[in-house]
C-alpha cells in the first residue's frame, strides 16, 4: 500500500471525487452555459462593432462626397466671381475710355469756340481801331459839311467790310 502513502495519489483521488461532485451537481452545465453566454455576448459586440464600422464607412464616404461637392461649388463660385470681376473691369475701362473721349471732345469744342470768340474780338477791336484812325485822319484832312458826309460814309463802309 505504498501507493496510498504518496501525496500525488491523494491529490488524484481528491480531484476525481471533486469532479464527481461537480458532475452530480451539474456544475459543468453552469460553466458551459456561462461560456455560451459569454460567446453570445462577444458575438453580439462583434456584430455591433461591425455594424458601427459599416455606418462609419458610409458616413465617411458621404462626408467625402459632400466635401468634394462643396469644393466643386466653391471652385464654380470663384470662377464665376473672377469672370464677373473681369467683365466689370472691362465695362469700367470701356466707360472710362468713353468718358475721356467725350471730355476731350468737349474740351476741344470749348477751345475752338474760345479761339473763334477771341478771333472775332480781335477783328472787332481792329475794326474799331481802323475806324477811329480813319475818322481822325479824315477829320484832320477834310473840313466842313463834305468832310462830315465823307466821314460818315467811310465809317459805315469800313464797319460793314470789317464785320
From Swiss-Prot:
Q: Which UniProt keywords apply?
A: ATP synthesis, Cell inner membrane, Cell membrane, CF(0), Hydrogen ion transport, Ion transport, Membrane, Transmembrane, Transmembrane helix, Transport
Q: What CDD domains does this protein's entry cite? A: ATP-synt_Fo_b
What domain of life is recorded for the organism? Bacteria
Kindly list the GO molecular function terms attached to this UniProt entry.
proton-transporting ATP synthase activity, rotational mechanism; proton-transporting ATPase activity, rotational mechanism
What is the membrane topology noted in the UniProt record heading this document? Single-pass membrane protein
Q: Which Pfam families match?
A: ATP-synt_B
Instruction: Name the InterPro entries for this protein.
Output: ATP_synth_b/b'su_bac/chlpt (IPR002146), ATP_synthase_B_chain (IPR050059)
Give any Gene Ontology cellular component. proton-transporting ATP synthase complex
Q: Please state where this protein is localized.
A: Cell inner membrane
Where does this protein have coiled-coil stretches?
Answer: none
Indicate the transmembrane segments per the record. 7-27
Q: What does this protein do?
A: F(1)F(0) ATP synthase produces ATP from ADP in the presence of a proton or sodium gradient. F-type ATPases consist of two structural domains, F(1) containing the extramembraneous catalytic core and F(0) containing the membrane proton channel, linked together by a central stalk and a peripheral stalk. During catalysis, ATP synthesis in the catalytic domain of F(1) is coupled via a rotary mechanism of the central stalk subunits to proton translocation.
Subunit-level organization: F-type ATPases have 2 components, F(1) - the catalytic core - and F(0) - the membrane proton channel. F(1) has five subunits: alpha(3), beta(3), gamma(1), delta(1), epsilon(1). F(0) has three main subunits: a(1), b(2) and c(10-14). The alpha and beta chains form an alternating ring which encloses part of the gamma chain. F(1) is attached to F(0) by a central stalk formed by the gamma and epsilon chains, while a peripheral stalk is formed by the delta and b chains.
Which family does the record claim for this protein? Belongs to the ATPase B chain family.
Give the protein name, as stated in the record.
Answer: ATP synthase subunit b 1
Q: Which gene encodes it?
A: atpF1
